[in-house]
Structures are given as C-alpha cells and as structure tokens.
C-alpha cells in the first residue's frame, strides 16, 4: 500500500491493489484517537505530526483489525522503511490518546503512560483534547 493523503491525526488515505485492481481506501489508525481538526490546535498538531512521520506515496505495511462504523479499515500502520508504528509514535508523542477497546495492545498502554508522565502534548494541560471521543 502507498499513502495518498493524511486526513487528520488518525486517518489516512492509501492505494492498495486488490485482485489486480488498484483502489483508494481510508485507513483509521487502530487503538488510538487523535483530537479532531475542529478541536483547534491539538487536532492540527496531530495531523501535522503524522505528516512528518509519513510522506505522500510512501510505502506502508498494515495489520488489519476490521472496520469502524464509518466503513474505514482499522489498521496498525507501519512505515516499510523502518517498520515504525505510526499509532504508537502518535501516542508516545502526546498527539493521540489510547482508544479504549478490548483488543488494545499493551504497547499502547505503555506509550500513553510514558506520554502522561512526561506531560507530552495533549497531556500538558487538561481538556477535551485528551478525550476526542467525548468531544464528538
């Protein structure tokens, strides 16, 4: 797959080939929730940070985890150049919160604990930017 667009701090667009046919898909980064763009500076910061981690047309590897209620593919997204996990980097940097669900991986809990302890990003001051699901 290849990145085509970064919509916000936890959603990207990508080209994939399925059955020999290319198609555009939306991927929602699994296990995390970044502030919404409409939430102001933290939503914009999350998107900007994600754009620094991955450039347009860059090759990505994905581990699929189903679909969300909007029909987006839920996936852990890795850069193929170094297999860096984008969701973990967003959480560790304080640009996204852990999305609480039964399948959340321990590494995400650890990354959020580190970000909170460092008061990184969204954890620097309290507010709805720490809980995007409540904002929606």
What is each of the regions a protein language model found here?
Residues 1-136:
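Small beta-barrel nucleic-acid-binding modules, primarily SNase/OB-fold domains
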């Amino acid at each position: 797959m290849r990145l085509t667009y970064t919509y916000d701090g936890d959603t990207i667009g990508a080209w994939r080939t399925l059955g020999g046919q290319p198609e555009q898909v939306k991927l929602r980064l699994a296990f995390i929730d970044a502030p919404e763009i409409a939430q102001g500076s933290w939503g914009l910061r999350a998107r900007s940070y994600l754009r620094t981690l991955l450039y347009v047309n860059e090759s990505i590897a994905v581990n699929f985890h189903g679909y969300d209620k909007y029909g987006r593919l839920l996936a852990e997204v890795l850069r193929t150049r170094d297999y860096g996990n984008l969701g973990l980097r967003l959480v560790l940097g304080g640009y996204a919160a852990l999305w609480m669900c039964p399948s959340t991986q321990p590494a995400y809990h650890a990354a959020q604990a580190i970000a909170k302890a460092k008061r990184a990003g969204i954890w620097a001051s309290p507010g709805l930017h720490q809980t995007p699901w409540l904002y929606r």
